[in-house]
């Protein structure tokens, strides 16, 4: 009797295997891995709204990511640039987005959701 189990198959196109984000229905904070190499935990209790807009940089730079997702909290605004960001928007709507971080551009073709850049701007210094 063979008791060996096959290793789980992973695919970059599967949202569960995407290195740009993860989903967890039990999280209380969004972990933002910004491009400045800092990690920030923003509590969903301070979430205000999210806004999906076209990336205006596309007009000047044809290789720029096509979408921009703004995630606003009471003390910070997170800007996510990429493609296929609708899945992130849905996860935020349910407070299930566990983390978000950028991935190298070479993975963009294999990922349904590709995050090209993540920046954070704090709106209040002393809270």
Residue ranges of predicted features:
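A short, compositionally biased
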Residues: 22-28, 62-67
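Anionic N-terminal interaction surfaces
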Residues: 1-25
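Phosphoinositide-dependent membrane-docking surfaces
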Residues: 42-58
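Helix-rich interaction surfaces within compact, conserved domain-sized segments
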Residues: 77-127
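Short, surface-exposed polybasic-and-hydrophobic patches located at secondary-structure transitions
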Residues: 57-88
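Short aromatic-glycine motifs in intrinsically disordered, low-complexity regions
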Residues: 27-41
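A structural detector for beta-sheet-dominated domains
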Residues: 33, 53, 72-74, 81, ...
């Amino acid at each position: 009797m063979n008791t060996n189990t096959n290793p789980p198959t992973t695919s970059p196109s599967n949202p569960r295997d995407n290195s740009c984000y993860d989903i967890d229905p039990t999280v209380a904070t969004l972990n933002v891995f910004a491009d400045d190499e800092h990690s920030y935990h923003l509590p969903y209790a301070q979430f205000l709204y999210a806004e999906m807009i076209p990336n205006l940089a596309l007009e000047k730079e044809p290789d720029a990511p096509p979408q921009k997702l703004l995630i606003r909290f009471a003390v910070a605004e997170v800007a996510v640039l990429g493609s296929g960001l609708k899945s992130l928007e849905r996860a935020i709507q349910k407070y299930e987005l566990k983390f978000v971080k950028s991935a190298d551009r070479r993975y963009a073709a294999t990922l349904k959701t590709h995050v090209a850049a993540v920046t954070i701007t704090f709106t209040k210094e002393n809270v």
